[in-house]
């Protein structure tokens, strides 16, 4: 070779081209980044990182391959005047190790040393073949700063990415109580529907003992009777509101006030026909309005069994009860 000086990089710039031997990566990092390019952000940050960032548990065996191959690289290039072969074992001798690009695990594939080097780079390095597999993580930087987290039982031994523990319940805490599934629609017989309607005409709200007694008498569940009364009260309140609006009243008359906390439920369920017509002029106007089955239905009815089961009673309740039974068990209040 006629110009051996052209193949060797200047002595003042090798630290800028690639890391010094003091920043030689441990064996675990060599195996982790053996298949990746050297222009990754992690590699560039690692090159400019001072030696204090390296973990304390770096094996000293990772520095032995460059010391063994440094004299052979100097003999091949013919530039033995830059240093003695024994000087490659020192940690600060960057010119000697800069001449052996193929022996370094952090060799830049497209760097100046690779372009000017005469020997082609081998695919696998002896240091990579002799390095044992990592014990816990592929990144030994976790061993220092994340020591208390790695010792936790959440992380498996062969995991290279820190997993999210699955035992934390805070992502599910905001959902609240799990919602029940949709209940099946109950199908009531004519006898059950008439008995429920008869009880509803007596009292709009039924107590728990009476509800359980009625459910056992009709062969129904307590929840079915409860849902039926809720849906029935909702329909009755809506029809009462439409009645007042059609008779020239206002919607606020159906809302509870301080003087009358229960305008719709208590007044209609407890008073007779004469008292209701005298006290509520809006209702009397509605009764003298043109005949409407819905208006006639909402009038106060006596609690006698003969009246509730009379053939002249409108069948609006029985026709629309099936539509109410499919609603949810939550009562919607009109406000």
Curated annotation (Swiss-Prot):
Gene Ontology biological process: cell differentiation in spinal cord; regulation of transcription by RNA polymerase II; ventral spinal cord interneuron specification
InterPro entries for this protein: H2.0_Homeobox_NeuralPatt (IPR051662), HD (IPR001356), HD_metazoa (IPR020479), Homeobox_CS (IPR017970), Homeodomain-like_sf (IPR009057), HTH_motif (IPR000047)
Induction note: By Pax6.
CDD domains according to UniProt: homeodomain (cd00086)
Main location: nucleus
PROSITE patterns linked: HOMEOBOX_1, HOMEOBOX_2
One cellular-component annotation, GO: nucleus
Keywords in alphabetical order: Developmental protein, DNA-binding, Homeobox, Nucleus
Biased composition (Low complexity): 83-95, 299-317
Compositionally biased residues, Acidic residues: 318-335
Region (Disordered): 56-102, 240-335
GO molecular function annotation: DNA binding; DNA-binding transcription factor activity, RNA polymerase II-specific
Localisation per UniProt entry: Nucleus
Protein family according to the UniProt entry: Belongs to the H2.0 homeobox family.
Function: Could have a role in patterning the central nervous system during embryogenesis. Has a key role in regulating the distinct phenotypic features that distinguish two major classes of ventral interneurons, V0 and V1 neurons. Regulates the transcription factor profile, neurotransmitter phenotype, intraspinal migratory path and axonal trajectory of V0 neurons, features that differentiate them from an adjacent set of V1 neurons.
Protein name: Homeobox protein DBX1
